[in-house]
Amino acid sequence: MKISDTLKNIFLYGNKYKTHSEAVIIACYFNPQGNPYRLIAFNKFYDSIKHLNHRIVECVIGDTQAELPETEFITRIHTPSLLWHKESLLNKIVSELPKKFKYVFWLDTDVIFTNKNWLVESVESLQTNNIMQPFEYCVHLDQDETDPSFNLDSYRISSRDPKLRHPKMWRSFCANHNESADLSCDVNYDKHGHVGFAWGARREILDTMPLYDKALIGGADHVMCHAAAGHIGHSCITKAFTENIKEINEWSTKFYALVQGKIGYVKGDLYHIWHGDLGKRQYLKRIQDFSSTLNEINEKDENGLYKTSVGGEYMEEYFNYRENTKTDAGSEPPLKITSKTDKRKDVIHKLGEIREQKSIKQNMSREEAYEHYKYYHPTRDDSFIESLVLGYLTNSTVEGSLLGGDILGAVIGDALNDTDDFSGGEYINDNFS
């Protein structure tokens, strides 16, 4: 680190994040639904990093209005397509960075670090690692919180135990990977650790292999972290990107060849600033639903952003639902995209959904699970799926067919109980990325 950096950190940045002249923070911001809490979160984030080297791009989608001022370090891009453009935007920023920056840190614009020295320590980590997360633990803050409402220290030890960890606290993927490769390879998200929020890498890694940019409804962080660890074809990814595995595996293999499993992290906590209900994000479901549509999106514009005329209704429904911050809005989850294989996929997804709901409530009786299902699914328009789920929940072909109206679905649902012990199973968190 240069002497000038040391002097700045001592005399100018006493209570701020410490700087490093060869490191740069990059980020992208888009808020097509005009969620006011997103802008509030951005302002808190930006106030914490504005004295550091940074480049931010705002993506203005459709006829929505820009929210950030254009400056030397904040630029603006327009696109008509409502997609998750995050990785495409980050890749564009990296391609235009001055060569003096050797270490690149891409952050979500809604995070705060408790470790004021995180940037300097992260650069130190990248002397021996190729990629890293600049935090050990992350916490989802509640609305209007500036600090967690619970004692973090009392939950650190149990953070890898799905049954004991605090529901708003995770250990980072990279911290778990450094402790044990078995932890990071686990199929349970809560065990392998959080994959999002903030990353850092040596510049040459991103120059050689740009971030995976085809996760156009999210999930690229999850793809990247398993790729960095050499988990090619990991079930976390295959169960989500059901139609794009070949392309993802090809990218992941090349990325791992560069990173070679050299993954680091630094001590400290990251706070995720509230800007909406986490339960509305539906990380896994949204990717599964959108997976087949990704094959139809291949064209890019002059800025390197994907453009499309398909999937727009689903994306708009999803973002409207996700970004609605009113507690009494009564909004519904987004529509499901239809395709040739939707019948089979819907059966698989719905069964998985019920299994996950049940595994979260491990002490729930079969009768309670049935009542739970009826409450959350009061009406259905597909008797086969209804009967399959009810046959599975009631463990009865007769009850499943009488209640759902399709004997074949009930038979299959009942039969699935032979291979799935209802009272067991592990907790599966839908927090995909």
Regions from the PLM with identified roles:
Residues 2-20, 31-38, 45, 215-355:
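C-terminal catalytic/acceptor-binding lobe
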Residues 21-27, 49, 53-56:
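Hydrophobic targeting segments
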Residues 29, 34, 48, 57-68, ...:
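A conserved acidic beta->alpha catalytic loop
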Residues 38-54:
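Short, acidic, metal-binding catalytic loop of nucleotide-sugar glycosyltransferases
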Residues 60-101:
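Active-site-proximal specificity loops/subdomain of glycosyltransferases
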Residues 101-114:
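Short beta-strand-to-loop acidic/aromatic patch adjacent to the donor-nucleotide binding site
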